[in-house]
């Protein structure tokens, strides 16, 4: 198959990310060839690209059209608009994607919206599900202005939870309340009261340490990121004295071993189509600006998600 273009790591280039010609996709029987039209960035893949060797291809999130359906007859048809994900290498013009990692999109969901679903949306959806039904429960979402946090606040409110959002600055509170947060906590420390049935925690450091002391009896803290610090000190007595508390380590690609990505992606797409969930694209640029947008993401120059179009 003819060459395509993809984002690759070049340690000598500004921002370490460049677009170069690479071999075109050669799909297995259970893979569809997708023409990518939009992609989104996540801190994890950008952070790794800053350390990866030359030639590594980053990228998790993608949206586009099926150029060639899977040979085994599974998955979306040729011409279908889809959202999908890969464990790496998704930032490319054309890709072979396993059909279990693809979901067809309703007509009213744009490709830019869909590109935000895979890592941020699925992480929020699956993390919230770890505690069981949330109706009437107290849920705390830390890092709430980020991509995962944005989805988590909305999905928790939709599930009937009483939602508290944690933010770094007071001026972020109005936007979080608009998303659906009932209350907003400002700063890197979580007060010991009220107590929470579920904490979705993506910050690490002091935020994680104090969140563990704010769990209700039987409460669970799902830790899924360390945007502030990977080192945590916490009061073990505060954590265990509540009784039956749990600290759950969440890694999306491990969780997807239990349920294919296509299931959650379709659920997110249906919620957006129904007007119950709103993806927030803070920045939309051509993919030729990948290096600059990646740097802006890591410097926290915008909230929510950045989408690049091809």
Per-region residue spans from a language model:
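C-terminal hydrophobic helical "lid"/dimerization subdomain
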Residues: 2, 259-310
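Glycine-rich beta-strand-centered segment in the early N-terminal region that forms part
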Residues: 23-40, 48-89
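Mid-domain Rossmann-like dinucleotide-binding core that forms the NAD(H)/NADP(H) cofactor-binding site
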Residues: 115-186
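Glycine-rich phosphate-binding loop and adjacent beta-alpha segment
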Residues: 206-277, 310
């Amino acid at each position: 198959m003819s060459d395509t273009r993809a984002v690759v790591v070049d340690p000598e280039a500004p921002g370490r990310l460049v677009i170069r010609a690479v071999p075109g996709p050669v799909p297995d029987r259970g893979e569809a060839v997708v023409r990518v039209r939009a992609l989104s960035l996540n801190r994890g893949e950008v952070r790794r690209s800053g350390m990866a060797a030359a030639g590594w291809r980053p990228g998790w999130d993608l949206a586009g059209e099926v150029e060639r359906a899977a040979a085994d007859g599974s998955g979306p048809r040729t011409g279908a608009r889809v959202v999908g994900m890969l464990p790496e290498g998704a930032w490319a013009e054309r890709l072979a994607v396993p059909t279990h990692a693809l979901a067809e999109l309703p007509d009213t969901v744009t490709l830019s919206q869909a590109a935000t679903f895979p890592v941020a949306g699925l992480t929020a959806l699956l993390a919230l599900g770890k505690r069981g039904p949330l109706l009437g429960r107290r849920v705390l979402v830390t890092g709430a202005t980020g991509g995962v946090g944005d989805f988590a606040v909305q999905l928790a409110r939709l599930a009937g939870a009483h939602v508290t959002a944690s933010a770094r600055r007071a001026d972020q509170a109005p936007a979080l309340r608009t998303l659906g947060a009932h209350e907003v906590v400002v700063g890197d420390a979580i007060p010991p009261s009220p107590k929470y049935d579920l904490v979705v925690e993506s910050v690490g450091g002091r935020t994680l340490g104090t969140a563990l002391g704010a769990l209700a009896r039987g409460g669970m803290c799902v830790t899924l990121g360390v945007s502030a610090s990977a080192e945590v000190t916490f009061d073990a007595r505060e954590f265990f004295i509540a009784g039956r508390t749990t600290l759950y380590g969440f890694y999306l690609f491990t969780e997807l071993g239990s349920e294919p990505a296509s299931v959650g992606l379709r659920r997110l797409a249906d919620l957006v189509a129904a007007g119950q969930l709103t993806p927030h694209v803070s920045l939309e640029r051509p993919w030729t600006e990948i290096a600059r947008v990646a740097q802006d993401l890591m410097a926290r120059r915008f909230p929510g998600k950045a989408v690049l179009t091809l």
